[in-house]
Amino acid sequence: MGKGGNYVMVAASEVEELRQKNGEMEKAVEEMRKEMLQLWRRTQVAEEAEEHLCSQLAELEAESLDQARDYHTRIIFLTNQLSRFSSDSASP
């Protein structure tokens, strides 16, 4: 490369090489953008699935709590009945 004043003289082969590298880099950047977009979409799907699962889990937790309360009420009822029957059979 020779210098002419404030300008740098670049050979035509170097210009072509730089253009080729620039084109390759632009393709690489575009490919990275596509990959990033795909990853972003997959992340969105995963986040939506997580929200759905959390919602289902909350519903199941509420349902299990209701069932536990029902079972507890039933156990108390049966315990009271058993106690009453035991005391009735023990009485003359």
From Swiss-Prot:
GO terms for biological process: cellular oxidant detoxification; regulation of flower development; regulation of short-day photoperiodism, flowering. Keywords: Coiled coil. Residues 8-63 form a coiled coil. Induction: Accumulates in response to phosphorus, nitrogen, potassium, or iron deficiency. It comes from the Eukaryota. Disruption phenotype: Defects in flower and inflorescence development in short-day conditions and delayed flowering. Required for flower development in short-day conditions. This is Protein RESPONSE TO LOW SULFUR 4. The gene is LSU4.
